[in-house]
């Protein structure tokens, strides 16, 4: 039986996540499978992979053929590196302890690279948020200044409108007083 390691789609439209399964190559994409060995969520940044490493390695050693995406996932997780090192042990190039040490060194190097990438992304997010906040502060200052100018103009206009009105009310009173004085 030709076995494949491939992805089985789950999730909703435009938000897919996948199960990594061992299936007969003739089975439909989301159909019957032999074993589920992990999950893959490409929606996160970086993509989240939860993999049963030992089961994946066992199936690769048995000769199961991965799909292109699964091959990239297995390579990134170190399954193919482990297979390569086990091949060296089988040929007698080095011992199993040395192979394990090389694998751990490779894994630590890979994880430190991922941690650096994550830290860089966090810094970029913080810088972007800070820049957005500064831009918003500038916009708010401009709006506040324009509003203050508008209120000052309205107050001046209101004061100017009240001054002639007061003069107008005082002027008829003075005229009335003048006419009363003239009448006496």
Curated annotation (Swiss-Prot):
Per UniProt, the keywords (alphabetical) are: Ribonucleoprotein, Ribosomal protein
GO CC annotations on file = cytoplasm; small ribosomal subunit
Q: Please list the residue ranges that the record marks as compositionally biased, kind Basic and acidic residues.
A: 150-160
- List the residue ranges of the region (Disordered): 150-184
Task: Output one GO BP term.
Answer: translation
Pfam families for the chain: Ribosomal_S16
- The keyword Ribosomal protein is annotated on this UniProt entry: yes
InterPro entries hit by this protein? Ribosomal_bS16, Ribosomal_bS16_dom_sf
Acidic residues biased stretches: 164-173
Q: Where is the composition biased (Low complexity)?
A: 174-184
Q: Which cysteines are joined by disulfide bonds?
A: none
> A GO molecular function for this record?
structural constituent of ribosome
Which HAMAP family does this entry report, sorted A to Z?
Answer: Ribosomal_bS16
Question: Hey, which family's this protein in?
Answer: Belongs to the bacterial ribosomal protein bS16 family.
Q: Indicate what this protein is called per its UniProt record.
A: Small ribosomal subunit protein bS16
Species the sequence originates in: Bacteroides thetaiotaomicron (strain ATCC 29148 / DSM 2079 / JCM 5827 / CCUG 10774 / NCTC 10582 / VPI-5482 / E50)
Identify the gene encoding this protein.
rpsP
């Amino acid at each position: 039986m030709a076995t494949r390691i491939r992805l089985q789609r789950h999730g909703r439209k435009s938000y897919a996540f996948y199960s990594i399964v061992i299936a007969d190559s003739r089975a439909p994409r989301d159909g019957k499978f032999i074993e589920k060995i992990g999950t893959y969520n490409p929606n996160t940044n970086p993509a989240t992979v939860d993999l049963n490493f030992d089961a994946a390695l066992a199936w690769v050693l048995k000769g199961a053929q991965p799909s292109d995406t699964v091959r990239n996932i297995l390579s990134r997780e170190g399954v193919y590196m482990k297979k390569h090192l086990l091949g060296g042990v089988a040929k007698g190039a080095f011992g199993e302890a040395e192979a394990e040490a090389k694998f751990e060194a490779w894994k630590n190097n890979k994880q430190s690279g991922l941690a650096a990438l994550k830290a860089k992304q966090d810094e970029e997010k913080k810088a972007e948020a800070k820049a957005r906040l500064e831009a918003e502060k500038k916009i708010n200052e401009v709006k506040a200044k324009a509003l203050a100018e508008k209120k000052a103009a309205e107050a001046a206009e209101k004061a100017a409108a009240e001054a002639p009105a007061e003069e107008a009310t005082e002027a008829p009173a003075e005229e009335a007083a003048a006419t009363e004085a003239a009448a006496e």
